[in-house]
Protein backbone atom coordinates (compact mmCIF):
# COMPACT_ATOMS: atom_id res chain seq x y z
CA UNK A 1 0.00 0.00 0.00
CA UNK A 2 1.30 3.43 -0.90
CA UNK A 3 2.48 5.34 2.20
CA UNK A 4 2.44 8.64 0.29
CA UNK A 5 -0.65 8.88 -1.86
CA UNK A 6 -0.73 11.35 -4.75
CA UNK A 7 -3.10 14.26 -4.16
CA UNK A 8 -6.21 12.99 -5.92
CA UNK A 9 -8.17 16.15 -5.11
CA UNK A 10 -9.92 17.04 -8.35
CA UNK A 11 -11.07 13.74 -9.79
CA UNK A 12 -12.99 13.93 -13.03
CA UNK A 13 -15.16 10.92 -13.76
CA UNK A 14 -14.01 9.59 -17.12
CA UNK A 15 -16.33 7.60 -19.36
CA UNK A 16 -15.26 5.25 -22.16
CA UNK A 17 -18.11 6.08 -24.52
CA UNK A 18 -17.51 8.13 -27.65
CA UNK A 19 -20.98 9.49 -28.47
CA UNK A 20 -21.43 13.25 -28.53
CA UNK A 21 -23.08 14.93 -25.52
CA UNK A 22 -26.88 14.88 -25.59
CA UNK A 23 -28.47 18.17 -24.60
CA UNK A 24 -31.42 18.19 -22.23
CA UNK A 25 -32.42 19.45 -18.80
CA UNK A 26 -32.73 17.31 -15.69
CA UNK A 27 -33.92 18.69 -12.39
CA UNK A 28 -33.38 16.51 -9.32
CA UNK A 29 -36.79 17.23 -7.86
CA UNK A 30 -39.33 14.94 -6.17
CA UNK A 31 -41.56 15.23 -9.25
CA UNK A 32 -38.92 14.35 -11.83
CA UNK A 33 -36.81 11.86 -9.89
CA UNK A 34 -38.37 8.81 -8.21
CA UNK A 35 -36.54 5.95 -6.47
CA UNK A 36 -38.15 2.69 -5.38
CA UNK A 37 -36.28 0.13 -3.34
CA UNK A 38 -36.42 -3.45 -4.64
CA UNK A 39 -36.51 -5.64 -1.51
CA UNK A 40 -34.29 -8.66 -1.07
CA UNK A 41 -37.16 -10.60 0.48
CA UNK A 42 -40.84 -10.25 1.36
CA UNK A 43 -41.97 -9.49 4.93
CA UNK A 44 -42.35 -12.66 6.97
CA UNK A 45 -45.78 -11.65 8.30
CA UNK A 46 -44.88 -12.42 11.91
CA UNK A 47 -42.20 -11.58 14.44
CA UNK A 48 -41.03 -8.94 16.91
CA UNK A 49 -40.39 -6.25 14.32
CA UNK A 50 -42.45 -4.17 11.90
CA UNK A 51 -41.38 -3.61 8.31
CA UNK A 52 -42.50 -0.16 7.15
CA UNK A 53 -42.80 0.78 3.49
CA UNK A 54 -42.23 4.53 3.50
CA UNK A 55 -42.53 7.32 0.96
CA UNK A 56 -40.46 10.44 1.62
CA UNK A 57 -40.12 13.66 -0.37
CA UNK A 58 -37.26 16.13 -0.18
CA UNK A 59 -35.60 14.38 2.76
CA UNK A 60 -32.38 12.43 3.07
CA UNK A 61 -32.57 9.01 4.70
CA UNK A 62 -30.71 10.38 7.74
CA UNK A 63 -33.28 13.19 8.06
CA UNK A 64 -36.04 10.59 7.76
CA UNK A 65 -34.48 8.52 10.55
CA UNK A 66 -34.10 11.53 12.83
CA UNK A 67 -37.73 12.59 12.37
CA UNK A 68 -38.97 9.05 12.93
CA UNK A 69 -36.84 8.46 16.04
CA UNK A 70 -37.99 11.77 17.53
CA UNK A 71 -41.63 10.95 16.78
CA UNK A 72 -41.41 7.45 18.27
CA UNK A 73 -39.16 8.27 21.21
CA UNK A 74 -36.54 5.71 20.20
CA UNK A 75 -32.88 5.88 19.21
CA UNK A 76 -31.93 6.28 15.55
CA UNK A 77 -29.89 3.08 15.77
CA UNK A 78 -33.05 1.19 16.75
CA UNK A 79 -34.47 1.84 13.27
CA UNK A 80 -33.33 -0.54 10.55
CA UNK A 81 -32.81 0.51 6.94
CA UNK A 82 -31.34 -1.17 3.87
CA UNK A 83 -29.80 1.79 2.05
CA UNK A 84 -29.55 5.55 1.67
CA UNK A 85 -31.83 7.37 -0.76
CA UNK A 86 -31.35 10.71 -2.49
CA UNK A 87 -32.74 13.80 -0.74
CA UNK A 88 -33.80 15.54 -3.95
CA UNK A 89 -36.21 12.79 -4.97
CA UNK A 90 -39.41 11.03 -4.09
CA UNK A 91 -38.13 7.84 -2.49
CA UNK A 92 -39.88 4.64 -1.51
CA UNK A 93 -37.89 2.56 0.93
CA UNK A 94 -38.23 0.00 3.70
CA UNK A 95 -37.52 0.67 7.37
CA UNK A 96 -37.94 -1.54 10.41
CA UNK A 97 -38.85 -0.78 14.02
CA UNK A 98 -39.56 -2.94 17.05
CA UNK A 99 -43.16 -4.06 17.26
CA UNK A 100 -43.54 -2.48 20.71
CA UNK A 101 -43.51 0.93 18.97
CA UNK A 102 -46.63 0.24 16.88
CA UNK A 103 -49.02 2.34 18.99
CA UNK A 104 -46.61 5.30 19.00
CA UNK A 105 -46.23 4.96 15.24
CA UNK A 106 -49.97 5.05 14.64
CA UNK A 107 -50.29 8.15 16.84
CA UNK A 108 -47.44 9.85 14.97
CA UNK A 109 -48.82 9.30 11.45
CA UNK A 110 -50.40 12.80 11.09
CA UNK A 111 -47.16 14.48 12.22
CA UNK A 112 -45.07 12.33 9.89
CA UNK A 113 -47.37 13.20 7.00
CA UNK A 114 -46.80 16.91 7.72
CA UNK A 115 -43.05 16.21 7.37
CA UNK A 116 -43.55 14.72 3.86
CA UNK A 117 -43.32 11.17 5.21
CA UNK A 118 -46.08 8.68 4.48
CA UNK A 119 -46.17 5.15 5.88
CA UNK A 120 -47.68 3.09 3.06
CA UNK A 121 -47.67 -0.37 4.65
CA UNK A 122 -46.89 -1.86 8.07
CA UNK A 123 -46.13 -5.59 8.16
CA UNK A 124 -44.82 -7.82 10.97
CA UNK A 125 -41.34 -9.17 10.33
CA UNK A 126 -38.97 -11.52 12.15
CA UNK A 127 -35.80 -9.42 12.24
CA UNK A 128 -34.39 -5.92 12.02
CA UNK A 129 -33.59 -4.63 8.54
CA UNK A 130 -29.86 -4.29 7.93
CA UNK A 131 -27.71 -2.27 5.56
CA UNK A 132 -27.47 -3.99 2.18
CA UNK A 133 -30.68 -6.01 2.59
CA UNK A 134 -32.03 -4.97 -0.80
CA UNK A 135 -31.79 -6.34 -4.31
CA UNK A 136 -31.46 -2.96 -5.98
CA UNK A 137 -33.48 0.11 -6.88
CA UNK A 138 -35.83 1.09 -9.66
CA UNK A 139 -35.67 4.63 -10.98
CA UNK A 140 -37.81 7.09 -12.87
CA UNK A 141 -36.22 10.20 -14.38
CA UNK A 142 -37.93 12.89 -16.43
CA UNK A 143 -35.62 14.72 -18.84
CA UNK A 144 -36.86 18.05 -20.23
CA UNK A 145 -36.13 20.27 -23.24
CA UNK A 146 -35.44 17.21 -25.38
CA UNK A 147 -35.54 17.73 -29.15
CA UNK A 148 -36.72 14.96 -31.46
CA UNK A 149 -33.15 14.55 -32.73
CA UNK A 150 -31.81 14.15 -29.19
CA UNK A 151 -34.65 11.75 -28.36
CA UNK A 152 -33.41 9.53 -31.19
CA UNK A 153 -29.88 9.74 -29.76
CA UNK A 154 -31.21 8.83 -26.31
CA UNK A 155 -32.93 5.71 -27.63
CA UNK A 156 -29.81 4.50 -29.47
CA UNK A 157 -27.51 5.25 -26.52
CA UNK A 158 -29.84 3.38 -24.16
CA UNK A 159 -29.44 0.32 -26.39
CA UNK A 160 -25.66 0.75 -26.21
CA UNK A 161 -25.65 0.99 -22.41
CA UNK A 162 -27.99 -1.99 -22.03
CA UNK A 163 -25.40 -4.06 -23.88
CA UNK A 164 -22.12 -2.56 -22.67
CA UNK A 165 -22.92 -1.51 -19.10
CA UNK A 166 -21.27 1.50 -17.49
CA UNK A 167 -18.61 2.37 -14.87
CA UNK A 168 -19.90 2.07 -11.31
CA UNK A 169 -18.64 5.38 -9.95
CA UNK A 170 -19.91 6.86 -6.72
CA UNK A 171 -22.10 9.87 -7.46
CA UNK A 172 -21.79 13.43 -6.20
CA UNK A 173 -24.23 12.68 -3.37
CA UNK A 174 -21.50 10.62 -1.71
CA UNK A 175 -19.24 13.63 -1.26
CA UNK A 176 -21.51 16.34 0.20
CA UNK A 177 -22.71 19.70 -1.11
CA UNK A 178 -19.20 21.04 -1.67
CA UNK A 179 -17.82 17.71 -2.89
CA UNK A 180 -15.11 17.67 -0.21
CA UNK A 181 -16.38 15.25 2.46
CA UNK A 182 -13.56 12.89 1.51
CA UNK A 183 -10.99 15.41 2.77
CA UNK A 184 -12.48 15.21 6.27
CA UNK A 185 -12.49 11.42 5.96
CA UNK A 186 -8.82 11.50 5.01
CA UNK A 187 -8.04 13.75 7.98
CA UNK A 188 -9.86 11.36 10.34
CA UNK A 189 -7.88 8.43 8.93
CA UNK A 190 -4.64 10.35 9.51
CA UNK A 191 -5.70 11.20 13.12
CA UNK A 192 -5.72 14.91 12.24
CA UNK A 193 -9.45 15.24 12.94
CA UNK A 194 -11.64 13.64 15.60
CA UNK A 195 -15.44 13.75 15.69
CA UNK A 196 -17.60 12.76 18.65
CA UNK A 197 -20.38 11.52 16.37
CA UNK A 198 -19.21 8.04 15.36
CA UNK A 199 -21.85 7.71 12.64
CA UNK A 200 -20.77 10.92 10.89
CA UNK A 201 -17.11 9.98 11.32
CA UNK A 202 -17.69 6.60 9.66
CA UNK A 203 -19.66 8.24 6.85
CA UNK A 204 -16.81 10.67 6.13
CA UNK A 205 -14.27 7.83 6.09
CA UNK A 206 -16.49 5.93 3.64
CA UNK A 207 -16.54 9.08 1.49
CA UNK A 208 -12.73 8.98 1.41
CA UNK A 209 -12.81 5.28 0.47
CA UNK A 210 -15.28 6.14 -2.30
CA UNK A 211 -13.07 8.97 -3.53
CA UNK A 212 -10.08 6.65 -3.88
CA UNK A 213 -12.25 4.10 -5.69
CA UNK A 214 -13.42 6.75 -8.18
CA UNK A 215 -9.84 7.89 -8.76
CA UNK A 216 -8.74 4.30 -9.43
CA UNK A 217 -11.66 3.68 -11.79
CA UNK A 218 -10.86 6.84 -13.77
CA UNK A 219 -7.27 5.66 -14.09
CA UNK A 220 -8.35 2.24 -15.39
CA UNK A 221 -10.63 3.82 -17.96
CA UNK A 222 -7.76 6.07 -19.03
CA UNK A 223 -5.76 2.90 -19.63
CA UNK A 224 -8.55 1.46 -21.77
CA UNK A 225 -8.79 4.70 -23.77
CA UNK A 226 -5.05 4.69 -24.46
CA UNK A 227 -5.22 1.09 -25.66
CA UNK A 228 -8.13 1.98 -27.95
CA UNK A 229 -6.66 5.22 -29.30
CA UNK A 230 -3.05 4.37 -30.08
CA UNK A 231 -1.27 1.92 -32.33
CA UNK A 232 0.63 -0.86 -30.52
CA UNK A 233 4.00 0.83 -31.01
CA UNK A 234 2.63 4.14 -29.63
CA UNK A 235 0.94 2.81 -26.48
CA UNK A 236 4.04 2.63 -24.28
CA UNK A 237 4.97 6.26 -24.94
CA UNK A 238 1.40 7.32 -24.10
CA UNK A 239 1.45 5.35 -20.84
CA UNK A 240 4.69 7.09 -19.85
CA UNK A 241 3.23 10.55 -20.50
CA UNK A 242 3.25 13.04 -17.58
CA UNK A 243 -0.52 13.25 -18.11
CA UNK A 244 -0.97 9.71 -16.74
CA UNK A 245 1.28 9.41 -13.65
CA UNK A 246 -0.74 6.56 -12.11
CA UNK A 247 0.01 4.39 -15.16
CA UNK A 248 3.80 4.76 -15.06
CA UNK A 249 4.43 1.73 -12.84
CA UNK A 250 2.16 -0.37 -15.04
CA UNK A 251 4.05 0.86 -18.13
CA UNK A 252 7.28 -0.68 -16.80
CA UNK A 253 5.69 -4.14 -17.09
CA UNK A 254 4.35 -3.63 -20.60
CA UNK A 255 5.74 -5.63 -23.50
CA UNK A 256 4.68 -5.44 -27.16
CA UNK A 257 2.95 -8.81 -26.81
CA UNK A 258 1.05 -7.73 -23.69
CA UNK A 259 -0.13 -4.56 -25.42
CA UNK A 260 -1.44 -6.53 -28.40
CA UNK A 261 -3.20 -8.98 -26.07
CA UNK A 262 -4.89 -6.17 -24.14
CA UNK A 263 -5.89 -4.38 -27.35
CA UNK A 264 -7.66 -7.53 -28.53
CA UNK A 265 -10.22 -7.23 -25.72
CA UNK A 266 -13.56 -5.94 -26.99
CA UNK A 267 -15.20 -4.63 -23.80
CA UNK A 268 -14.80 -0.96 -22.73
CA UNK A 269 -13.05 -1.84 -19.44
CA UNK A 270 -9.83 -3.77 -20.10
CA UNK A 271 -9.22 -6.76 -17.81
CA UNK A 272 -5.70 -7.23 -16.44
CA UNK A 273 -3.99 -10.25 -14.97
CA UNK A 274 -4.51 -10.12 -11.21
CA UNK A 275 -7.81 -8.25 -11.32
CA UNK A 276 -10.27 -9.34 -8.64
CA UNK A 277 -13.35 -10.45 -10.54
CA UNK A 278 -16.76 -11.26 -9.09
CA UNK A 279 -19.62 -13.34 -10.42
CA UNK A 280 -22.42 -11.03 -11.56
CA UNK A 281 -24.85 -9.85 -10.29
CA UNK A 282 -23.69 -11.53 -7.07
CA UNK A 283 -21.27 -14.25 -6.06
CA UNK A 284 -17.72 -14.91 -4.95
CA UNK A 285 -14.58 -12.97 -5.82
CA UNK A 286 -11.69 -14.63 -7.61
CA UNK A 287 -8.36 -13.61 -9.15
CA UNK A 288 -8.13 -13.28 -12.92
CA UNK A 289 -5.38 -15.53 -14.26
CA UNK A 290 -6.44 -15.74 -17.92
CA UNK A 291 -7.54 -12.41 -19.39
CA UNK A 292 -8.76 -14.00 -22.64
CA UNK A 293 -11.22 -16.30 -20.85
CA UNK A 294 -12.36 -13.77 -18.26
CA UNK A 295 -12.79 -10.90 -20.73
CA UNK A 296 -15.14 -13.13 -22.75
CA UNK A 297 -17.15 -13.93 -19.61
CA UNK A 298 -17.22 -10.20 -18.83
CA UNK A 299 -18.70 -9.49 -22.26
CA UNK A 300 -21.39 -12.07 -21.52
CA UNK A 301 -22.26 -10.36 -18.18
CA UNK A 302 -21.30 -13.49 -16.23
CA UNK A 303 -18.63 -11.68 -14.22
CA UNK A 304 -17.44 -8.13 -13.62
CA UNK A 305 -14.21 -6.55 -12.37
CA UNK A 306 -14.08 -5.04 -8.89
CA UNK A 307 -12.22 -2.15 -7.31
CA UNK A 308 -11.04 -1.67 -3.75
CA UNK A 309 -12.78 0.20 -0.98
CA UNK A 310 -9.56 0.05 0.95
CA UNK A 311 -9.35 -0.55 4.67
CA UNK A 312 -8.84 -3.59 6.87
CA UNK A 313 -9.83 -7.13 5.95
CA UNK A 314 -10.07 -6.78 2.18
CA UNK A 315 -8.43 -8.58 -0.72
CA UNK A 316 -6.24 -6.45 -2.96
CA UNK A 317 -5.55 -7.27 -6.59
CA UNK A 318 -2.43 -9.04 -7.84
CA UNK A 319 0.23 -8.78 -10.57
CA UNK A 320 -0.39 -6.16 -13.26
CA UNK A 321 -3.68 -4.99 -11.76
CA UNK A 322 -1.95 -4.26 -8.46
CA UNK A 323 0.60 -2.01 -10.21
CA UNK A 324 -2.25 0.46 -10.67
CA UNK A 325 -4.44 -0.31 -7.66
CA UNK A 326 -1.60 0.06 -5.14
CA UNK A 327 -1.47 3.80 -5.76
CA UNK A 328 -5.06 4.21 -4.57
CA UNK A 329 -4.76 2.27 -1.30
CA UNK A 330 -4.30 4.08 2.01
CA UNK A 331 -3.09 1.87 4.85
CA UNK A 332 -4.12 4.52 7.39
CA UNK A 333 -7.82 3.74 6.84
CA UNK A 334 -8.82 1.49 9.74
CA UNK A 335 -12.44 0.99 8.67
CA UNK A 336 -13.37 -2.35 7.14
CA UNK A 337 -12.49 -2.61 3.48
CA UNK A 338 -14.26 -4.52 0.73
CA UNK A 339 -14.50 -4.84 -3.05
CA UNK A 340 -17.06 -3.03 -5.20
CA UNK A 341 -18.15 -3.79 -8.74
CA UNK A 342 -16.27 -1.48 -11.10
CA UNK A 343 -18.77 -2.13 -13.87
CA UNK A 344 -22.53 -2.73 -13.77
CA UNK A 345 -25.51 -3.04 -16.10
CA UNK A 346 -28.90 -1.35 -15.93
CA UNK A 347 -31.87 -3.67 -16.40
CA UNK A 348 -35.48 -3.21 -17.53
CA UNK A 349 -34.55 -0.03 -19.40
CA UNK A 350 -37.46 1.86 -20.94
CA UNK A 351 -37.40 5.24 -22.66
CA UNK A 352 -40.46 7.17 -23.81
CA UNK A 353 -40.43 10.44 -25.72
CA UNK A 354 -43.33 12.88 -25.29
CA UNK A 355 -42.84 15.32 -28.19
CA UNK A 356 -45.65 17.72 -27.28
CA UNK A 357 -43.91 18.43 -23.96
CA UNK A 358 -40.33 17.82 -25.14
CA UNK A 359 -39.97 15.34 -22.27
CA UNK A 360 -38.15 12.02 -22.25
CA UNK A 361 -39.15 9.61 -19.49
CA UNK A 362 -36.64 7.01 -18.29
CA UNK A 363 -37.34 3.85 -16.29
CA UNK A 364 -34.57 1.43 -15.27
CA UNK A 365 -33.29 -0.84 -12.49
CA UNK A 366 -29.80 -0.75 -10.96
CA UNK A 367 -28.01 -3.07 -8.53
CA UNK A 368 -27.75 -1.90 -4.93
CA UNK A 369 -25.09 0.74 -4.39
CA UNK A 370 -25.17 2.02 -7.98
CA UNK A 371 -26.13 5.60 -8.78
CA UNK A 372 -28.84 6.67 -11.22
CA UNK A 373 -26.98 9.93 -11.78
CA UNK A 374 -23.91 7.99 -12.97
CA UNK A 375 -26.09 6.06 -15.41
CA UNK A 376 -27.44 9.43 -16.59
CA UNK A 377 -23.93 10.85 -17.00
CA UNK A 378 -23.02 7.82 -19.13
CA UNK A 379 -26.17 8.31 -21.19
CA UNK A 380 -25.77 12.05 -21.75
CA UNK A 381 -21.95 12.03 -21.97
CA UNK A 382 -21.68 14.71 -19.30
CA UNK A 383 -20.14 15.02 -15.84
CA UNK A 384 -22.64 17.30 -14.14
CA UNK A 385 -25.53 15.08 -12.97
UniProtKB/Swiss-Prot annotation:
- One GO term (biological process): tRNA pseudouridine synthesis
Substrates-to-products reaction catalysed: uridine(13) in tRNA = pseudouridine(13) in tRNA
> What organism does this protein naturally occur in?
Helicobacter hepaticus (strain ATCC 51449 / 3B1)
Q: Which UniProt keywords apply?
A: Isomerase, tRNA processing
Spell out the PROSITE patterns in the cross-references. Answer: TRUD (PS50984), UPF0024 (PS01268)
Q: Which GO terms describe its molecular function?
A: RNA binding; tRNA pseudouridine(13) synthase activity
Q: What is this protein called?
A: tRNA pseudouridine synthase D
Gene3D superfamilies given in the database record: TruD, catalytic domain
Q: What is its EC number?
A: 5.4.99.27
Query: So which residues are the signal peptide here?
Result: none
Domain TRUD, residue spans? 165-305
* InterPro entries (UniProt xref): PsdUridine_synth_cat_dom_sf (IPR020103), PsdUridine_synth_TruD (IPR001656), PsdUridine_synth_TruD_CS (IPR020119), PsdUridine_synth_TruD_insert (IPR011760), TruD_catalytic (IPR042214), TruD_pseudoU_synthase (IPR050170)
State the family it belongs to. Belongs to the pseudouridine synthase TruD family.
Q: Which SUPFAM superfamilies match?
A: Pseudouridine synthase
**What's an example GO cellular component term for this entry?**
cytosol
What is annotated as the active site? 86
Pfam families membership: TruD (PF01142)
Amino acid sequence: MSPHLPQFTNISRIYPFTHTPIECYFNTSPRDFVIKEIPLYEPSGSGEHLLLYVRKKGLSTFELLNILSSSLGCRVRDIGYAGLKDKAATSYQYLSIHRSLQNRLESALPHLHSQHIKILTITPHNHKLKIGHLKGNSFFMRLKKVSSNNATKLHSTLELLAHSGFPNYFGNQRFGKEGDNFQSGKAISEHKLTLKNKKISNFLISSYQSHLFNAWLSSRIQLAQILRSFKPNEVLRALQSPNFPTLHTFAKSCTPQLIKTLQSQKQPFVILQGDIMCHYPFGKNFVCDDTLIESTRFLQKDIAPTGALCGTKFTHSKCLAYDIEEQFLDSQIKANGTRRYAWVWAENIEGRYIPQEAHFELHFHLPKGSYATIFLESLLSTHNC
